[in-house]
Amino acid sequence: MAVSSIASIFAAEKSYSIPPVCQLLVSPVLNPLYDAKAESQIDAWCAEFLKLQPGSEKAVFVQESRLGLLAAYVYPTIPYEKIVPVGKFFASFFLADDILDSPEISSSDMRNVATAYKMVLKGRFDEATLPVKNPELLRQMKMLSEVLEELSLHVVDESGRFVDAMTRVLDMFEIESSWLRKQIIPNLDTYLWLREITSGVAPCFALIDGLLQLRLEERGVLDHPLIRKVEEIGTHHIALHNDLMSLRKEWATGNYLNAVPILASNRKCGLNEAIGKVASMLKDLEKDFARTKHEIISSGLAMKQGVMDYVNGIEVWMAGNVEWGWTSARYHGIGWIPPPEKSGTFQL
């Protein structure tokens, strides 16, 4: 599929509307311990990571993006000492994603950085520095290593689930970056296979287990088909909603690796019709989640220690991700004012 074929579908459409979704999930609740001090620490870390000048346009954008706020929405019960490390990790995830997608980074540098990040995840920082020659990337990699070391003090990951999930994300980032550079547009099924991993949801679900010290992996609970199903539903919901939110930003940079334009090209429909189909997919996922959650309760699986903490944690993640997507300026730009109804019309 060629990029030109996607661009031609939307040539006549200058605006699009996102309808309300997330109407069947639990209401999002902000962690009451998340305060201005925590947010300022995370913002300061982001500014140092990117070497931002105070008051610059990029610094204001990062500050209004409120990258640490996502942690407070999706982990509303964790204690204060865990909020900042998790917030920094989320921020590093977004910023590293931007770096790996940057045309200023050569494909060889990108491969070396992805390989180095995998070594950092396994605590092998000295080895990780060997393939990376760019001094700025080395500096950022050291900062990421420090964040992961701090995070490890608050997460139980004896099975290695979190590290394994992050490694898969980095593997798929390499594939995604290759597709972007070569302007390869996959079909919808192939894209959703990739997006399921590049969305980064798997390590974030692993953090539910690790931060709350549920030890579900060690006890074999995660192998149950119903648990696998709620994980799959949550992953697709988060990935698809993020694609709705990021469409305008990605469109402006010529990035067509998004469910909306790919679906439009596959189904031969316009932009707004494609958005309506994605919104309908989200609503179906929410209904499916409610049914599966009921099955977990009625089957007796909910009686196992930690199961409902995990299932409810996935639902909170889905709802919190929607809330943050409409609150943050990351997808909308400086001066963004969140609409109370979490829907709106946008200009391309």
From Swiss-Prot:
Enzyme class at the top of the EC tree: lyase
Positions of short motif DDXXD motif: 97-101
Pathway(s) the chain acts in: Secondary metabolite biosynthesis; terpenoid biosynthesis
Domain of life: Eukaryota
SUPFAM superfamilies, sorted: Terpenoid synthases
The protein's required cofactors: Mg(2+)
The enzyme's E.C. designation: 4.2.3.77, 4.2.3.-
Keywords on record: Lyase, Magnesium, Metal-binding
Reaction(s) this enzyme catalyzes, per UniProt: (2E,6E)-farnesyl diphosphate = (+)-germacrene D + diphosphate
GO biological process: terpenoid biosynthetic process
Binding site for Mg(2+) 1: D97, D101
Binding site for Mg(2+) 3: N242, S246
InterPro entries: Isoprenoid_synthase_dom_sf (IPR008949), Terpene_cyclase-like_2 (IPR034686)
Note in the entry: Selaginella moellendorffii contains two distinct types of functional terpene synthases (TPS) genes, the typical seed plants TPS genes (SmTPSs) and a microbial type TPS genes (SmMTPSLs).
Role description: Sesquiterpene synthase converting farnesyl diphosphate to eight sesquiterpenes, with (+)-germacrene D and an unidentified oxygenated sesquiterpene as the major products. Has no diterpene synthase activity.
PANTHER family per UniProt: BETA-PINACENE SYNTHASE-RELATED, TERPENE SYNTHASE
Protein name as annotated: (+)-germacrene D synthase
Organism: Selaginella moellendorffii (Spikemoss)
Phylogenetic placement of the source organism: Eukaryota, Viridiplantae, Streptophyta, Embryophyta, Tracheophyta
